[in-house]
Each structure stands twice: as structure tokens, then as C-alpha cells.
């Protein structure tokens, strides 16, 4: 192998999947790499490390120009009304971003009444589906959704269902797609508009605001090169804020002397966002990409499944391959030592 092109390289910093992007850099020092991402941020770490380990000069090529410009808007209307406006103004397909699979699936039901397909499009959907087997509980729901022009897309669906949604979307037969923030690598779903339902996400321990990188990656799905001249990214205000604004407007126009309506509180697992937060995410630079110590189990499991590992061009077997790879790991010295020191324990725990 002389040349390796690595797309979506920002996943190098993913706590679970990052090793899939890290290992080639460590195991193939004599190979030329092209590392690509729209949201890399500061790449000084990689430039210095690659130059040190490979002895080659490293060029950084940057461009902030999008072939399809995006228009951003912060919304204080209800989510349903925002979807209606996008449909009425011809800005479909719309990808509605949820942050759990259940929320995405549950939301799809509510958009059936919008009836976004023409009669001709409904016929085309039925023809495209043909004798496709929706042979599971979620499959029966999905059939109702897609025949109405509404799709669901997330990792919890069977692959055949995800592929069907992608095909119908590519044919222009889905006007609304409810999905999660994970839509990305290897997925080709044409999107005209992206609609964020929120700007915070539970990460397993807490509920932080999205990073600049995550926001940019999701927003970047809007606008289809070759199909659209522009794309739209809308962000909903928190649901309780929208409801409270509506209650205040209703109270202001009412002649009733009833007691003031109590304001609705935010839902659980919530971090506050507003227009200022939205603008910071819209205008912010992506954070730098860093490796993670706690993803070592993934690479160790991968390496020990091989009878022989290749490190620095040499055949290295067993635990030695794991240790040598971890010692070459890009990162601070203390982090590198922590990774290497944990390898023996993880290796031995597999039985």
C-alpha cells in the first residue's frame, strides 16, 4: 500500500471508534496519508507527529468555502409549525434531528397528518416498495410512515429498513426524515434542510451542549450539491421556552382576569440553550481532535484477534504487538504510559 485516503478523520477523537482512525497511522509509517474532514480544527498535533515518525513533510490544505451555502435560523415557533413552514416553502427533504432513537421514531407519527406527498408521489412510493417485507413490529410502523412520505433513520433499525429509507430519500419520495445525530459515515441521504430539535445531548454521564464540531457536522448535511443552490439549518428553542412564550402571548391578548399561568419547567436531561448559544455554535471553530485513553479495549480486542501484528514493518505476535502499538500512540507521555500500562490487564481479561 502506497497511499491511504482517510475520510471523516475527525472521528480520530471519538471515545469509542477513534482507534479505527488511529491504528493505520501507527502501523503504516511508510505510507502516504491524505486525512480529510470538514471539521478538524487545530491539526498541529498531527502535523508534528507525522513529520517526526515518517520523516516526511506534511502539508495542510484548508478551505472554508461550501459549494452549497447554508442559511441558519433560530426558531421560537413550535416544532410542528417549523416543519410545516419548511414544507410549504419548498425546502424539503427535511432531516429532523433527535438525540435518541425512541424520540425519532415517536416523532414520525406526528407528521403523518401533514400529508407531504402528491398523489403521483404516493403511487411511486408504493411501486418502489413493491413486495418489500416489513416483517417486524417497527417494520409495520415504518411502512405507514414511508407510504406517507415520512422516514425514520437511526442505528437501531435493521439494515434493510435503513437502506429502504435511503433509497426512497434518494428518489425524492421522503419529504421528512426523523433521525438521530449519528447520520453520517457511509450514509447517502440527500437533505435540503436540517432541523435541530435541541442543542444538548446526554453523553452517558451528563447533558452538555453540543460541541462546535458536532453541530457543524450535523448542520453540514443540509444542501445537496447538484440538487440545491442553498440549504437551511433551523434550530428550535427549548420546548418549554416555546410553550411559555405562547402562553404569554395568549395571556397578553386575553381579557380574562384569571391568575397568571404557571410557567412550564424544562424536561429532565436538559442543558439550557438560547439564541446566543446557537450563534456561538454557528460561528465557532471546531475543537481540536484528541485521542482518548479509555478506548484502548477496542484496539486491543482488534489486535489480539490477529495471529500476527505488523508494527513498524516488523511481524510482532501476541501481547507484544499491542504494547508496541500503544507505546507509539499519539498523545501526551503520561497518557501514553497509562495506555501501555493497561494493556496487559486488558489482554489477560479476555480468557
PLM feature segments, named:
Residues 9-22, 45-46, 161, 187-190:
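Conserved ATPase-coupling elements of RecA-like P-loop NTPase cores
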Residues 160-169, 277-351:
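C-terminal accessory/connector segments of nucleic-acid motor ATPases
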Residues 1, 162-166, 170-198, 220, ...:
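Beta-edge loop/turn motif
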Residues 7-9, 38, 180, 197-198:
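Walker B catalytic acidic pair
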Residues 31-32, 189, 193-254, 258, ...:
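Conserved segment of the helicase C-terminal RecA-like domain
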Residues 9, 23-34, 39-115, 142-155:
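Conserved interdomain linker/interface between the two RecA-like ATPase lobes of SF2 helicase motors
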Residues 9-13, 151, 184, 200, ...:
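Catalytic acidic motif of RecA-like/P-loop NTPases
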Amino acid at each position: 500500500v502506497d497511499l491511504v485516503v482517510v475520510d471523516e478523520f475527525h472521528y480520530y477523537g471519538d471515545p469509542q471508534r477513534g482507534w479505527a482512525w488511529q491504528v493505520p497511522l501507527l502501523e503504516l509509517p511508510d505510507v502516504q496519508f491524505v486525512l480529510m474532514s470538514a471539521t478538524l480544527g487545530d491539526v498541529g498535533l498531527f502535523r508534528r507527529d507525522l513529520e517526526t515518525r515518517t520523516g516526511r513533510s506534511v502539508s495542510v490544505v484548508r478551505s472554508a468555502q461550501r459549494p452549497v451555502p447554508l442559511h441558519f435560523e433560530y426558531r421560537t415557533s413550535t416544532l410542528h409549525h417549523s416543519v410545516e413552514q419548511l414544507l410549504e416553502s419548498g425546502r424539503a427533504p427535511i432531516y429532523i434531528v433527535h438525540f435518541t432513537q425512541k424520540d425519532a421514531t415517536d416523532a414520525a407519527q406526528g407528521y403523518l397528518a401533514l400529508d407531504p406527498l402528491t398523489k403521483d408521489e404516493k403511487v411511486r412510493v408504493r411501486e418502489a416498495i413493491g413486495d418489500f417485507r416489513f416483517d417486524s413490529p417497527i417494520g409495520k410502523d415504518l411502512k405507514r410512515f414511508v407510504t406517507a412520505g415520512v422516514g425514520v433513520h437511526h442505528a437501531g433499525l435493521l439494515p434493510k429498513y435503513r437502506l429502504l429509507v435511503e433509497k426512497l430519500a434518494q428518489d425524492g419520495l421522503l419529504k421528512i426524515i426523523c433521525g438521530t445525530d449519528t447520520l453520517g459515515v457511509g450514509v447517502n441521504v440527500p437533505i435540503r434542510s436540517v432541523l435541530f430539535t435541541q442543542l444538548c445531548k446526554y453523553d452517558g454521564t451528563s447533558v452538555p451542549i453540543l460541541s462546535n464540531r458536532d453541530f457543524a457536522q450535523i448542520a453540514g448535511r443540509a444542501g445537496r450539491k447538484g440538487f440545491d443552490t442553498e440549504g437551511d439549518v433551523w434550530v428550535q428553542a427549548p420546548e418549554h421556552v416555546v410553550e411559555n412564550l405562547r402562553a404569554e402571548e395568549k395571556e397578553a391578548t386575553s381579557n380574562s382576569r384569571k391568575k397568571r399561568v404557571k410557567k412550564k419547567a424544562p424536561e429532565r436531561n436538559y442543558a439550557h440553550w438560547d439564541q446566543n448559544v446557537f450563534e456561538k455554535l454557528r460561528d465557532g471553530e471546531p475543537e481540536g481532535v484528541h485521542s482518548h485513553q479509555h478506548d484502548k479495549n477496542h484496539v486491543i480486542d482488534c489486535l489480539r484477534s490477529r495471529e500476527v501484528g505488523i508494527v513498524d514493518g516488523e511481524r510482532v505476535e501476541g501481547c507484544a504487538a499491542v504494547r508496541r502499538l500503544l507505546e507509539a500512540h499519539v498523545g501526551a507521555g503520561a497518557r501514553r504510559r497509562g495506555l501501555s500500562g493497561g494493556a496487559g490487564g486488558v489482554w489477560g481479561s479476555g480468557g
